[in-house]
């Protein structure tokens, strides 16, 4: 295929596993990022993302201390889903302030992770990889697992897209049609948790929100339709990720920060393009505005 030939000519074979992981992460981030920006739960996503470090640290410690066959990816997915369910239930059932819950979980998750990783002989390198991303250490087993997670996200959203739109824009409609708001809200948080685990391999724990939020914010400037926003955000993620991997490889830099800088540059460019946008076109949609499906 022409596209594969182009990629083979541009990227060395060593980077192909990293490119596959970045492609899957870009699709997941473009899809889920669109919902969390419109639903205004970016801060919750940040809490889930940072709490991953706790699961990663526990998995690495168990692996080192007891020689258990536990991957950091397994610890990350378990902690992310657990935190997502906890945040959702506390918010919906007890109506506690979200900012208080987020602050508590954010700090506890990071603290547990740092304590566990500090007990490892390779503390600095492991911590740097998970905080700032190092997609070059993706193994074939991790790649298969990431592919399964990505397919699950795409399949679930394809089936439940209408319900998620109603959750984001019209919860009264869901209640009138006897749909469980709690169930769909928790499902969205779980999908967000899975997405953050996928992004951990590309961006690291600290910088993954830039891949979730910035491309969606750019797309929202130029389209009303939710489906268009998802497509644009996914394409922007793919372009910035591939370019970031190549630049990081050539310049011997960490991948996550390079991609984050490219995302920031793309967002700044969108601000300039916004000024030259056709004046007769209605104002682009904002994350808070109602978006059509």
UniProtKB/Swiss-Prot annotation:
Q: Which Pfam families match?
A: ABC-3
Name the source's superkingdom: Bacteria
Coiled coil, from the record: none
Q: How does it sit in the membrane?
A: Multi-pass membrane protein
| Subcellular location(s) per record | Cell inner membrane
Ordered alphabetically, the record's keywords are: Cell inner membrane, Cell membrane, Membrane, Transmembrane, Transmembrane helix, Transport
Regions that span the bilayer: 18-38, 41-61, 68-88, 101-121, 135-155, 187-207, 242-262
GO cellular component annotations, sorted alphabetically?
Answer: ATP-binding cassette (ABC) transporter complex; plasma membrane
Q: Which SUPFAM superfamilies match?
A: ABC transporter involved in vitamin B12 uptake, BtuC
Q: Tell me, what is an example of a GO biological process annotation in this record?
A: transmembrane transport
What role is this protein assigned?
A: Part of an ATP-driven transport system CT_415/CT_416/CT_417 for a metal.
Similarity-based family: Belongs to the ABC-3 integral membrane protein family.
Spell out the protein name for this chain. Probable metal transport system membrane protein CT_417
**Which species is the source of this protein?**
Chlamydia trachomatis serovar D (strain ATCC VR-885 / DSM 19411 / UW-3/Cx)
